[in-house]
Amino acid sequence: MIVPLVPKLAIVASSGAADPTRASIPFHIAANGAAASGVETLIILAGDATELLRDGVAAGVQGVGIPPLAALLEKCAEAKIPIHV
């Protein structure tokens, strides 16, 4: 029996609000790239990245050339992308 493989991606993020572009890129890849392409995706936060989920932090994070982190988190929630801390 051939079982079709479902592409899966785990993204590990460790950058926090001090580096807004690096902090936002994992969420951008997950929401606008992988999940939008049908790839089962999850995000794992470690180190400084864990601060991004604190109340009010995401609202102040705006990377260069990508959407604001708050919008990316909203899109991740809509796509039901799990975020593990």
Regions found by a protein language model. Name each.
Residues A23-A36, I43:
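Histidine-anchored nucleotide/phosphate-binding helix
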Residues S37-G38, K80:
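Glycine-centered short loops/turns at secondary-structure junctions
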Residues A59-V85:
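A glycine-rich helix N-cap at a beta->alpha junction
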Residues I2-V3, A35:
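Acidic, glycine/proline-rich low-complexity segments that act as flexible tails and inter-domain linkers
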